[in-house]
Structures are given as C-alpha cells and as structure tokens.
Amino acid sequence: MNLADKVLAVNNDLPIRTDSPVHSGKVRSVYWLTATDSKRLIEEKGYDVPSDTSLAIMVISDRISAFDCIWSGENDMRGVPGKGAALNAISNHWFKMFKEQGLADSHILDIPHPFVWIVQKAKPVMIEAICRQYITGSMWRSYTKGERDFCGIELPEGLAKDSKLTSLLQTPSTKGILEGIPGVPAVDDVNITRKNIEDNFEAFNFKSVDDIARYEKLLTEGFDVISTALSKIDQVFVDTKFEFGYVKDVNGDDKLIYMDEVGTPDSSRIWDGEQYRAGKVVENSKEGFRQLLLNHFPDADILLNKDRMSEREALARDNKLPLSVLMDVSKTYTDIAEKITGNKIVLSDNPKAEIIAILREQYQLID
C-alpha cells in the first residue's frame, strides 16, 4: 500500500444509512441519521440529549484547502497524510478542556474513530468568531493601507507587523453570505461590528441580545485556555476562529455551545515561541502553506483577489504540488498535534475501510 492510499481524500461516499443528502464541506462531510437511528443510538449509547435529537456522523478528510480551493499533489496525493486525524485530535483535546473548566459543551457526543465524530444537530450562530492577539494577516494588510477602524475597533498609530496587541481583540465576520441585514454587505465572510450584531441579533441566529455577551465571554475564555496551554509548550496563540451554535439540553432548553473545530492549525495561527523571540515567524499552522502558495506561483494576486476566482480555481485544478510540500504540511500538523495532546498521530492504513467496519459493527449504521 502506498502513501496515497492512507489519505482519506473522498469522504462523502460512505454507505451510511441516511434519508437526507450528504453535506460536503471543504474538509468535512456530514451524514444526517434517520430519526430511528438517532433515537436508537441515544438510547443504546446513553447520550445526554433529548430522545428526539437529530444526530449526524461527521467525517473529516485529509484534503487541504487554502484561498477557497482544494489543492493536491504529485503521485495522486489528494490530501495531506495525517491531517484529518491531527485536526480532530486537537479539537477533541480543547473541547474536553473547555468542558472540564466549566466553559461550555461542544456538539460532539461520541468519537468512534480518529476521523469520525457523532454530533447533535445545532443551529449555528452565523458569525465567524475571530480573536486576535497579534496584528498580522488581513488586519495587518488593512493597517498598511491606512485603515485604522477594524470591525468597529480603533487601532492606534505605530503598530509593527506581527507585534502583540495591547489587548485581545474580537473581530467577527459573517458566516457565509447573509442577505437583508442593514449595514452588512451580502458578500462572503465580510467584517462586522458589535453594533451590527446587536442591531440584528436575530438575523445572526442569536436567541437574545444577552447571548451576544455570552458568546463573547466564551470566545475570550476559550482563547485564554488555549493560549495558556500552548505557552507551556512554547507556542504562541496568535489568532483564531471559533464557531458557536445552539442545541437542546436534556431538559429541552436552548444552550449555547462551541462547534465545528477549535484551536487547530486550520482555524488558527500558531507560532513557534523560541523563533518568535528571535525575531522570526515560524508557522505551525495552515498559514505556512498559504505563504508557500503565495511564493510558489508567479502572480500572487490570483490567490488574493476574489474577482479572479475562476483563475484561482484553474490554478488549483491544473497544478499538482510537489510531494515534499504536502509532506512538510503533514509534519507541521502531526507534530503540533502531538505536542498539544501528548499522543502520537498514527496513520491509518485504510481509513475508509476502518470507518465502515466500526460504523457497521459497533453502531449498526451500515447495512
């Protein structure tokens, strides 16, 4: 078996019993279980949710996306070995820590396999909850253009690239394209202010105005938990994106939870502490891959300019990256996962076959 066979590139074709279309995201696919299977698993496994809760199987892949495109490599390498398992392991670690420290629950009810979560259905808050401790990335690009108002926050003069901000800043954006919200352009992932959220809290799926403060508190507390833990392994938590949603608790009441993923190299910038103190930025996140792509192709504007999306998609489709590039990304992801969790990331020989066997034999979800 060659290395490409150990990569789970296609994750939306599993024979899981469902009566709904499979949702295929950039990295994860979601299989909504039938009402009968959801109720059965809640009873058999003792999940702490109402008996009529809708459950789903969420399967991560090893695909790598950047600049809204999926990238692949030579030798039919359609993903990054170990990436999916590393991302799930990191999220599992932080979600568990959040719960132990009394912050909030997540949507995860069970982990049958390193690539698989069983989750309860949540109503997502339509906000990309972004926190920044350092000025870099899109904030720095805006700053260099003379912009000093960022998501309604006034930035001081004299800031230096990659420097630490005086306080943790929350700089939210929309989750996808939201239409009909006054003052919020109907474009993907557009920056918004707290006032935008307050004035239109229902459009962002908040149950009440008070829940805005609750979400902000969970965002700050979650960031601080991860930042403190990363500092102990000499890593700098630079910025991150959280997602939140509502689920029903066992009493049928709404509760705000963390969802999607948290504190991973896909959703965060993580810098090596020793290198940062020496004046260098060494990425232990997907940002390193993004920078490589910007340097790899002659016309970086294709990757940054949303008006050139068709050219960008052709670039990703027609160019196979060197195998060494994907293996470097693999090492970045598995190394940081092992540092965070203290456990080795083991590559599955045939992840799809393993998942099918477990879901058939232990969960009776495959005929």
Curated annotation (Swiss-Prot):
InterPro entries to which the protein is assigned, alphabetical: SAICAR_synt/ADE2_N, SAICAR_synthase_Vibrio-typ
Signal peptide (from-to): none
SUPFAM superfamilies, A to Z: SAICAR synthase-like
Reactions that this protein is recorded to catalyse: 5-amino-1-(5-phospho-D-ribosyl)imidazole-4-carboxylate + L-aspartate + ATP = (2S)-2-[5-amino-1-(5-phospho-beta-D-ribosyl)imidazole-4-carboxamido]succinate + ADP + phosphate + 2 H(+)
Keywords attached to this entry: ATP-binding, Ligase, Nucleotide-binding, Purine biosynthesis
Domain of life (superkingdom): Bacteria
Keyword Translocase attached: no
Keyword Ligase: yes
Pfam family, one: SAICAR_synt
Parts forming coiled coils: none
Disulphide bridges, residue numbers: none
Any GO MF annotation of the entry: ATP binding
Top EC category: ligase
GO cellular component term, pick one: cytoplasm
Enzyme Commission (EC) number: 6.3.2.6
Pathway field: Purine metabolism; IMP biosynthesis via de novo pathway; 5-amino-1-(5-phospho-D-ribosyl)imidazole-4-carboxamide from 5-amino-1-(5-phospho-D-ribosyl)imidazole-4-carboxylate: step 1/2
Protein family (similarity comment): Belongs to the SAICAR synthetase family.
HAMAP family in the record: SAICAR_synth (MF_00137)
Protein name: Phosphoribosylaminoimidazole-succinocarboxamide synthase
Natural source organism: Colwellia psychrerythraea (strain 34H / ATCC BAA-681) (Vibrio psychroerythus)
